[in-house]
């Protein structure tokens, strides 16, 4: 289901047989209609960013619900797909903060230790938040709790009110939190623009003796 170390750690924060419930949910959801991302990519965020390499978390809400957008990592879309509004604003803030990045696929961030996690890992086509409140939040809350237990520092980037509620799970004083309004067009001008999350993250990592993220890669 997921990277094995992730799997063992996450399981300790969930009720017994919860993974079985997730599999049953996925069987029913994918059998009953079009769901994003493709099933093999539901746990991609955990597969491409191993726990031992994770040093940044960017928490999204749920996958993009349009055709060919969702990849299994938050905010990212395939290179040939136009950037959705939130990603446009993320790249605009990145350009103002560090420099321009022309591509929309954020997989290179994931390979550097940036866990691009959505709180809800699936969505019905065309129905934003259509799977919210059903199965995923205990699982992804467990991911945050696992990261909170890490001995090495993690920078948690929390955009928007929904993500900021997850601060309750981040109690380890070794970690850092960067929070701001969400990059969506509805809230980006309320404090997301100008928040400089990318340079601030690297400053925090480098202060801890860790290698910063090449956000432009």
Curated annotation (Swiss-Prot):
Function statement: Excises uracil residues from the DNA which can arise as a result of misincorporation of dUMP residues by DNA polymerase or due to deamination of cytosine.
Family: Belongs to the uracil-DNA glycosylase (UDG) superfamily. UNG family.
GO biological process: base-excision repair, AP site formation via deaminated base removal
Protein name: Uracil-DNA glycosylase
Keyword Glycoprotein part of the UniProt annotation: no
CDD domains the UniProt entry points to: UDG-F1-like
NCBIfam families attached to this UniProt entry: PRK05254.1-1, PRK05254.1-2, PRK05254.1-5, ung
Domain of life of the organism encoding this protein: Bacteria
Record bears the keyword RNA-binding: no
Class of the enzyme per the UniProt entry, highest EC level: hydrolase
């Amino acid at each position: 289901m997921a990277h094995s170390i992730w799997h063992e750690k996450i399981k300790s924060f969930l009720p017994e047989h919860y993974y079985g419930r997730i599999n049953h949910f996925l069987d029913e959801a994918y059998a009953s209609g079009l769901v994003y991302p493709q099933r093999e990519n539901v746990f991609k965020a955990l597969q491409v960013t191993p726990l031992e390499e994770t040093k940044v978390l960017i928490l999204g809400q749920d996958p993009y619900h349009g055709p060919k957008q969702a990849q299994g990592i938050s905010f990212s879309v395939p290179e040939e797909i136009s950037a959705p509004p939130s990603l446009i604003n993320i790249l605009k803030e990145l350009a103002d903060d560090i420099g321009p990045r022309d591509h929309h696929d954020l997989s290179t961030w994931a390979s550097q230790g940036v866990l691009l996690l959505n709180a809800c890992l699936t969505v019905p086509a065309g129905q934003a938040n259509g799977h919210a409140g059903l199965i995923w939040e205990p699982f992804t809350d467990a991911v945050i709790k696992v990261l909170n237990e890490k001995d090495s520092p993690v920078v948690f980037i929390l955009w928007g009110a929904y993500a900021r509620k997850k601060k309750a799970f981040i109690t380890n004083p070794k970690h850092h939190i960067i929070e701001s309004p969400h990059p969506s067009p509805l809230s980006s001008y309320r404090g997301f623009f100008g928040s400089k999350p990318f340079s601030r993250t690297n400053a925090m990592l480098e202060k801890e003796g860790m290698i910063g993220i090449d956000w432009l890669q």
